Amino acid sequence: MSGPMQRSSQPQFISSVERNNQSNGPGTPLIDSIDVDQIVIPEKNSWKNLFSYIGPGFLVSIAYIDPGNFETDLQAGAQYKYELLWIILIASCAALIIQSLAARLGVVTGKHLAEHCRAEYPKATNFILWILAELAVVACDIPEVIGTAFALNMLFKIPVWCGVLITGLSTLMLLLLQQYGVRKLEFLIAILVSLIATCFLVELGYSKPNSSEVVRGLFVPELKGNGATGLAISLLGAMVMPHNLFLHSALVLSRKVPRSVHGIKEACRFYMIESAFALTIAFLINISIISVSGAVCGSDNLSPEDQMNCSDLDLNKASFLLKNVLGNWSSKLFAVALLASGQSSTITGTYAGQYVMQGFLDLRMTPWIRNLLTRSLAILPSLIVSIIGGSSAAGQLIIIASMILSFELPFALVPLLKFTSSRTKMGQHTNSKAISVITWGIGSFIVVINTYFLITSFVKLLLHNGLSTVSQVFSGIFGFLGMLIYMAAILYLVFRKNRKATLPLLEGDSTVRIVGRDTATEGEGSLGHLPREDISSMQLPQQRTASDLD
């Protein structure tokens, strides 16, 4: 529908034509885009509408089966068998709830998480949150760099450090995507990742893990042995990534959702269903990888070569786990799937970086320049580590990158929980008490396990580093001061009151009445115009509308 909106009992749509006719204010699109293939949600109630919402959840779920997840899953299974499966279960459930909140924030307010942060926090706080978000994007890109380098090593015997340099060429691939569209490559990626997932599931049948041990690992929390806590944190960081919250809240802005209470609730429900389906697939893939790794490496019939691989398992050695299914082709096919996984994650990481920069700083870069910047920052540590320590050290860098993501998660999660629990931002679409308790419990658990690991690891480092007493004292002072700053920053975000009202726009109104107030309050900074042209103008994979299925 185009033209001026009129009051009606029917749900109202806000078209891009109307948006372009507005004055250049906060709601003006960053890109004067023109012909954008919009995804329009029909007004009629139908389960076919679900097909119109499919897309964002699957793009986000790519991060749950990236090389970082492969690496942490393989090491978790090889070192602790099925002991850490419960982390995957909890992380997957937490991810579903948290990602659904991110989608809801975008649908209800018409603004994504980074934009809300810019509107809500002082300049200094906003700048720090932007730096942390950018570091999260870079930390997420490190596994993609190393995973791609490992894949090139398996395919062409290229040294890992050379492969790290070659990964910069993925920028050229992104350029091609911008020119020819994403659909065909995403379809190819889906086939390759599905193929490797199928192989692990079939291998699961060959390896025959002890079902009672698997069930125990899923439902009985345990953290035994040295390094279990650190690996659990890396698993958590690999599953619930801070950049995904920014990404998901922005991707949903590409849909033309009915601006009515019912239309918004339906959109939130369908986005949750789509996310649940996508994350269930990712959950099964992660569970199968850990179980295969645990069953194979825990076997008593391993050859000396396989025993050596299991003792220092990383992505570069993991193909032997698939020999029962693929034989001599295991290495090549695993490398191709690893390459596909790394490149697909690079694409979503690039978009996440764009949304972060646009939201926090009101700046926008050409995608290939944005990709080149992020990739350059990720290549530097990967190159140094791969040259000095080889593939084993590069694999450990993936674990460290995942741990960094876990430590940074509260700085994206707390603002999300605060915003979605705020009636002045979400109106009647705020989180229920049950959801609030669950999500704040998840956030508290993450902070507690991160703090516990920091303290125990730092104390061990102080006691066994061989430094003089004076050096230990000063190291302890600075180390614990850093931990106090970390905790204080989180507490600041938790207890700071929201000060900006960003309300949903309903039924064509420019103002929304807050429950319990006598006057209409203008939704400050609320865009309310979906689809957002600065979002939908990006050449993301487009889905058929529900009307196309009739």
From Swiss-Prot:
It comes from the Eukaryota. Keywords: Ion transport, Iron, Iron transport, Membrane, Transmembrane, Transmembrane helix, Transport. The chain crosses the membrane at residues 50-70, 83-103, 127-147, 158-178, 185-205, 233-253, 276-296, 333-353, 368-390, 397-417, 435-455, 473-493. InterPro entries: NRAMP_fam (IPR001046). It holds the Pfam family Nramp. It is found in: Membrane. GO terms for biological process: iron ion transmembrane transport; manganese ion transport. GO terms for cellular component: plasma membrane. Its main location: membrane. It is a multi-pass membrane protein. GO terms for molecular function: cadmium ion transmembrane transporter activity; manganese ion transmembrane transporter activity. Residues 1-26, 536-550 have a biased composition (Polar residues). Residues 1-30, 523-550 are annotated as: Disordered. Belongs to the NRAMP (TC 2.A.55) family. Probable metal transporter. This is Metal transporter Nramp3. It comes from Oryza sativa subsp. japonica (Rice).
